[in-house]
Amino acid sequence: MANHFRTDRVGMEIKREVNEILQKKVRDPRVQGVTITDVQMLGDLSVAKVYYTILSNLASDNQKAQIGLEKATGTIKRELGRNLKLYKIPDLTFVKDESIEYGNKIDEMLRNLDKN
C-alpha cells in the first residue's frame, strides 16, 4: 500500500521536472508548446509513461513533437538524474494524451444539443 503512494509521488515529481526541463533545457523547436499532463509509473519505478499534449491540432505537428520528445529522452533523463534523488532514473515512454481532445469533443457535442 505504501508503494502506491511512492509511485504517485515519484510520478508527480517527474511530471514537474520534465515540464521544467522541456521549458528551460531542451532547445528543440519540435517540443515547443508541449505540456506534460500526467506520468504513470510502473510499480517498481523502472518505467514512466509520460502523457503530453501539444497546442497544435495538426497531425504533422503531433508527429514532430513525438519525434522531438523521443530524441530529447537522453537529455531529459540526464537532467532528471541531476535533480531527483532516485537510485535509478526510470525509462521514459512518451504518449500523446487524447483525453483533453476527447473532452473538447464531448463539450462541443453538448453545446450542439443545447442549440437544437
UniProtKB/Swiss-Prot annotation:
GO terms for cellular component: cytosol. One of its GO terms (molecular function) is ribosomal small subunit binding. The keyword Cytoplasm applies. The gene is rbfA. Its main location: cytoplasm. One of several proteins that assist in the late maturation steps of the functional core of the 30S ribosomal subunit. Associates with free 30S ribosomal subunits (but not with 30S subunits that are part of 70S ribosomes or polysomes). Required for efficient processing of 16S rRNA. May interact with the 5'-terminal helix region of 16S rRNA. This is Ribosome-binding factor A. Keywords: Cytoplasm, Ribosome biogenesis. It comes from Streptococcus pneumoniae serotype 19F (strain G54). The keyword Cytoplasm applies. HAMAP family: RbfA (MF_00003). It is found in: Cytoplasm. It comes from the Bacteria. InterPro entries: KH_dom-like_a/b, RbfA, RbfA_dom_sf, Ribosome-bd_factorA_CS. GO terms for biological process: maturation of SSU-rRNA. Belongs to the RbfA family. Monomer. Binds 30S ribosomal subunits, but not 50S ribosomal subunits or 70S ribosomes. Disulfide bonds: none annotated.
